[in-house]
Amino acid sequence: MSLDRVDWPHATFSTPVKRIFDTQTTLDFQSSLAIHRIKYHLHKYTTLISHCSDPDPHATASSIAMVNGLMGVLDKLAHLIDETPPLPGPRRYGNLACREWHHKLDERLPQWLQEMLPSEYHEVVPELQYYLGNSFGSSTRLDYGTGHELSFMATVAALDMLGMFPHMRGADVFLLFNKYYTIMRRLILTYTLEPAGSHGVWGLDDHFHLVYILGSSQWQLLDAQAPLQPREILDKSLVREYKDTNFYCQGINFINEVKMGPFEEHSPILYDIAVTVPRWSKVCKGLLKMYSVEVLKKFPVVQHFWFGTGFFPWVNIQNGTDLPVFEEKEEESIEQANAGSPGREQTSTRFPTSTSMPPPGVPPSGNNINYLLSHQNQSHRNQTSFSRDRLRR
């Protein structure tokens, strides 16, 4: 079973279905071909973008046709925002116009994907539609988080596994993700999207994680010679200077624009990284470890990652056999049937009746965070300062 290619044309494709219902199926996910393909492509894109420390912020096209094709679809999604202005008046939990935006996406995306792909690949559209459609937040909860961010990476990986990105370079990775993050920040601001499953002040970021991995990787080969060092991200003017060419600065700049107060209070994890981790290579390594624990192994996040039979199948990586499948409750099946678009996440009510995993909003322990972000020869003072600061707050 290949991690970098689907067995085209022998692979079969189907509308993705829910397979993760509880703690046990979250554990099953860890032995799936799907997660190994996710990890393979995460490593691939992180490596590629490490050779793209100073991309052209004005570039709009690639030498790879399918990169341009996906960019074109993303442009159309951006135009949908222009077509769908937010409803007037204050809204506490997201602007309801966002549901209309998602409705338009669901209606038009299949045709756009068919126009983007060669005709012999049209059978992959049901799977590709799910992953790309689920990359922009929940139309039900009007929120956005790391699971949706993961879904966009899965979209890029799916096209990659079809061989659509020959000779891909770091600049191509930057083009695609830069377009995606530009749209996502606009969606968040236009429709006031809530954080999905946020840990609050004790999370890395309200909405994103992968953006910081990609951004730290951009500078990890330069390390001491990088334009900025980790500590300097606390300087707002320097962050603004590099936000157009570095994803880490892009993420920090967005926080600076939408949050008030001292950075160490509203973003203590990112602050802790800045003041305790001296090199970008160590930042990237720590964030990758944190991503594995806080995203890929967290039920509240991965429960909304669904599985088809082509790109991310629910099969064992060792022998290719099907992983355990549990039937949905009857009322859940009815709810899904009535919810509309069949491959899209529709509800957040499908939590297991009992699980040892924390629900959304429960912060990870300070010890775990320090472990994930620790670096060699860190002083005892640095190891304990974050825990003391957390207790004081």
From Swiss-Prot:
<dbReference type="GO" id="GO:0003755">
    <property type="term" value="F:peptidyl-prolyl cis-trans isomerase activity"/>
</dbReference>
<dbReference type="GO" id="GO:0000159">
    <property type="term" value="C:protein phosphatase type 2A complex"/>
</dbReference>
<dbReference type="InterPro" id="IPR004327">
    <property type="entry name" value="Phstyr_phstse_ac"/>
</dbReference>
<dbReference type="GO" id="GO:0005634">
    <property type="term" value="C:nucleus"/>
</dbReference>
<keyword id="KW-0697">Rotamase</keyword>
<keyword id="KW-0963">Cytoplasm</keyword>
<dbReference type="InterPro" id="IPR043170">
    <property type="entry name" value="PTPA_C_lid"/>
</dbReference>
<comment type="similarity">
    <text>Belongs to the PTPA-type PPIase family.</text>
</comment>
<keyword id="KW-0539">Nucleus</keyword>
<dbReference type="GO" id="GO:0019888">
    <property type="term" value="F:protein phosphatase regulator activity"/>
</dbReference>
<dbReference type="GO" id="GO:0031929">
    <property type="term" value="P:TOR signaling"/>
</dbReference>
<protein>
    <recommendedName>
        <fullName>Serine/threonine-protein phosphatase 2A activator 1</fullName>
        <ecNumber>5.2.1.8</ecNumber>
    </recommendedName>
</protein>
<keyword id="KW-0597">Phosphoprotein</keyword>
<dbReference type="InterPro" id="IPR037218">
    <property type="entry name" value="PTPA_sf"/>
</dbReference>
<dbReference type="GO" id="GO:0000082">
    <property type="term" value="P:G1/S transition of mitotic cell cycle"/>
</dbReference>
<dbReference type="Pfam" id="PF03095">
    <property type="entry name" value="PTPA"/>
</dbReference>
<feature type="compositionally biased region" description="Polar residues">
    <location>
        <begin position="365"/>
        <end position="386"/>
    </location>
</feature>
<dbReference type="GO" id="GO:0008160">
    <property type="term" value="F:protein tyrosine phosphatase activator activity"/>
</dbReference>
<dbReference type="GO" id="GO:0005737">
    <property type="term" value="C:cytoplasm"/>
</dbReference>
<feature type="compositionally biased region" description="Polar residues">
    <location>
        <begin position="335"/>
        <end position="356"/>
    </location>
</feature>
<dbReference type="GO" id="GO:0007052">
    <property type="term" value="P:mitotic spindle organization"/>
</dbReference>
<feature type="region of interest" description="Disordered">
    <location>
        <begin position="328"/>
        <end position="393"/>
    </location>
</feature>
<keyword id="KW-0413">Isomerase</keyword>
<dbReference type="GO" id="GO:0000785">
    <property type="term" value="C:chromatin"/>
</dbReference>
<dbReference type="GO" id="GO:0006357">
    <property type="term" value="P:regulation of transcription by RNA polymerase II"/>
</dbReference>
<dbReference type="GO" id="GO:0006914">
    <property type="term" value="P:autophagy"/>
</dbReference>
<dbReference type="GO" id="GO:0006281">
    <property type="term" value="P:DNA repair"/>
</dbReference>
<comment type="function">
    <text>PPIases accelerate the folding of proteins. It catalyzes the cis-trans isomerization of proline imidic peptide bonds in oligopeptides. Acts as a regulatory subunit for TAP42-associated PP2A-like phosphatases modulating their activity or substrate specificity, probably by inducing a conformational change in the catalytic subunit, a direct target of the PPIase. Can reactivate inactive phosphatase PP2A-phosphatase methylesterase complexes (PP2Ai) in presence of ATP and Mg(2+) by dissociating the inactive form from the complex.</text>
</comment>
<comment type="subunit">
    <text>Interacts with the phosphatase PP2A-like catalytic subunits PPG1, PPH3 and SIT4. Forms a ternary complex with SIT4-TAP42.</text>
</comment>
<dbReference type="GO" id="GO:0033554">
    <property type="term" value="P:cellular response to stress"/>
</dbReference>
<feature type="modified residue" description="Phosphoserine">
    <location>
        <position position="341"/>
    </location>
</feature>
